[in-house]
């Protein structure tokens, strides 16, 4: 089976700073790959490259085994890659359905917003993600942090995302909402969605990821099966740049 997404030798520089320096990774369908490293390690730059916000200076990107190049975030989204930012980028004054279709609204043949069609598409999607999510008519500013994550993930899936880049999805959530988001991520993976989980939270890493990769100073320290390492070994990778004994 081809990797859903593969990066070979990615490079990105800003002046004399090598923000991403020869980094490679692969992501299989249904896999959760944790992307780790201190601030400034190059994680965000690499994710912006995959999201089409920054061009590659070198290296290669493949989707389902075929080379891909993005000139804009719209190209990345059209290829099935969606990014869920830590701040979620939701319009607080709009309800969940309006956020789901924000910028990609359905319209009638007369050019008017087709509210009925958008609601009809939204209801089963929200039910699929969280059967207890009933507040689709309320402004998202009134929703809890976990419910807002549901809206952001639903927006990505509505447009056939096959790869999700998730930036700190459980930041500032309480235990019950963290558990809800964990369950949601596991169900998405079970459906074949590949997930790049950018996080500093070790419990999230060990609860969710199949593999983890660590970056430091723009370079790849190593990649390993999450179950094959301890938290202390992962911290050694992050802090000291010490690769695991048996990278996978």
Question: Which residues does each PLM region occupy?
Answer:
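Glycine-rich phosphate-binding loops of nucleotide-dependent enzymes
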Residues: 2-248
């Amino acid at each position: 089976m081809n990797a859903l997404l593969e990066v070979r030798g990615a490079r990105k520089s800003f002046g004399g700073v090598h923000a991403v320096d020869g980094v490679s990774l692969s992501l299989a369908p249904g896999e959760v790959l944790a992307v780790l490293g201190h601030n400034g390690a190059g994680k965000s730059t690499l994710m912006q490259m995959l999201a089409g916000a920054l061009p590659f200076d070198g290296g290669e990107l493949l989707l389902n085994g075929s080379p891909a190049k993005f000139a804009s975030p719209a190209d990345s989204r059209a290829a099935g890659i969606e990014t869920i930012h830590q701040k979620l980028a939701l319009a607080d004054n709009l309800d969940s359905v309006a956020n789901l279709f924000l910028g990609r609204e359905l319209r009638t043949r007369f050019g008017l917003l087709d509210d009925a069609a958008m609601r009809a598409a939204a209801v089963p999607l929200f039910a699929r993600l969280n059967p207890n999510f009933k507040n689709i008519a309320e402004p998202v500013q009134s929703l809890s942090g976990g419910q807002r994550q549901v809206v952001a993930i639903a927006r990505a899936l509505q447009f056939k995302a096959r790869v999700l880049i998730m930036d700190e999805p459980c930041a500032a959530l309480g235990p019950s909402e963290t558990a809800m988001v964990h369950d949601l991520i596991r169900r998405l993976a079970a459906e074949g969605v590949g997930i790049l989980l950018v996080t500093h939270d070790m419990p999230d890493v060990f609860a969710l990821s199949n593999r983890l990769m660590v970056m430091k100073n723009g370079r790849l320290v190593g990649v390993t099966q999450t179950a094959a390492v301890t938290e202390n070994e992962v911290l050694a990778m992050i802090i000291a740049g010490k690769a695991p004994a048996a990278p996978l």
